């Protein structure tokens, strides 16, 4: 073979190799995974690869194997956006996770923890709006953050006040079969002023409210920071948990980027839920560790890896 033919042959082989690699990468990027749990992304998770519309991102998530979704901002969206989300999710047979109904994670003024008729009436109005919003998107769960603690009041009085207001909220929700999930937020990295911080505290409050409409949102990221001991705390508060969220620590990115053994955590949730015929959504309330399409693929792979546990 002369030099010219040799070079041509080498170039052709390289081109075929590059084309094969490109084809393999494209096939990997379109793989639809079969997850054991209902992991729920949110708008923004896949926007680098599906940014044309809200429905575009929902369709992409569905095509990659995700069967649930959550949208904290649902009640703040326009009626047109809410309709688009609801219709697309119904068409794709995706389950709606949480949206935020009341409470600000950045609040500094107490609401639930003080006896204040004006503040409490605003909370109850928020709950009523949440009921209507849930009807529009076929949701069951809505996030409630009980706000800031009161520096001037004993913690036990604040707990009693919080329980009283939650009972009133529950009275509104119960006839509709809806559930507010209380989210404890960590005070060390993100929310130093929040009253509700730990899962045992949330468990105590939910037991006192004693309503199917008042349960716990166990955010693994927050609870790793506030108390750790994750699986034993999930086990201890299990009867009051209605919803989970994920995010690794430190950094609050996808599983595998921090210190939490998500494969074991997810296995515990899956196996116990299956044994008790329960069905949980795991909200992916975290950012992407990398930008662009590569970051989207890294998030998906993180859940593929964390979901790769043996079923008991």
Spans of model-derived segments:
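Mid-chain, structured segments of secreted extracytoplasmic proteins
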Residues: 85-115
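Glycine-rich, proline-tolerant flexible connector loops at the mouths of alpha/beta enzymes
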Residues: 70-90, 146-150, 189-190
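N-terminal small/glycine-rich loop or linker at the start of catalytic domains
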Residues: 32-44, 102-112, 146-150
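Histidine-acidic metal/acid-base catalytic patches
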Residues: 2-65, 138, 196-218, 222-312
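Catalytic-core regions built around general acid/base machinery
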Residues: 84-91, 168-172, 233, 265-268
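Active-site acidic/histidine proton-transfer and metal-coordination neighborhood
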Residues: 9-19, 27-33, 91, 112-215, ...
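Flexible loop residues that form catalytic
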Residues: 74, 147, 185, 249, ...
């Amino acid at each position: 073979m002369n030099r010219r033919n040799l070079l041509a042959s080498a170039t052709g082989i390289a081109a075929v190799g590059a084309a094969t690699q490109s084809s393999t990468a494209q096939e990997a990027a379109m793989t639809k995974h079969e997850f054991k749990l209902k992991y729920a992304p949110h708008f923004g998770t896949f926007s680098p690869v599906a940014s044309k519309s809200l429905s575009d991102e929902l369709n992409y998530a569905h095509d990659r194997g995700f069967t649930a979704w959550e949208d904290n901002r649902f009640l703040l969206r326009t009626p047109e956006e809410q309709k688009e989300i609801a219709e697309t999710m119904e068409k794709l047979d995706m389950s709606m996770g949480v949206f935020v109904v009341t409470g600000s994670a950045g609040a500094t003024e107490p609401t639930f923890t003080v006896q204040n008729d004006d503040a409490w009436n605003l909370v109850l109005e928020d709950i009523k709006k949440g009921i209507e919003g849930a009807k529009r998107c076929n949701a069951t769960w809505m996030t409630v953050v009980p706000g800031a603690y009161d520096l001037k009041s004993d913690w036990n009085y604040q707990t009693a006040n919080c329980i009283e207001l939650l009972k009133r909220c529950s009275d509104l929700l119960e006839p509709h079969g809806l559930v507010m999930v209380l989210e404890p937020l960590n005070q060390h990295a993100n929310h130093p002023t929040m009253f509700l911080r730990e899962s045992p505290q949330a468990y105590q409050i939910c037991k006192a409210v004693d309503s199917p409409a008042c349960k716990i949102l166990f955010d693994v990221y927050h609870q790793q920071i506030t108390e750790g001991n994750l699986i034993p705390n999930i086990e201890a508060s299990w009867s009051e948990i209605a919803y989970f969220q994920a995010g690794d620590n430190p950094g609050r990115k996808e599983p595998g980027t921090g210190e939490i053994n998500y494969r074991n955590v997810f296995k515990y949730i899956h196996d116990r839920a299956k044994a008790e015929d329960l069905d949980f959504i795991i909200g992916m309330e975290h950012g992407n560790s990398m930008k662009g399409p590569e970051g989207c693929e890294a998030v998906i792979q993180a859940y593929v890896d964390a979901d790769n546990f043996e079923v008991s």
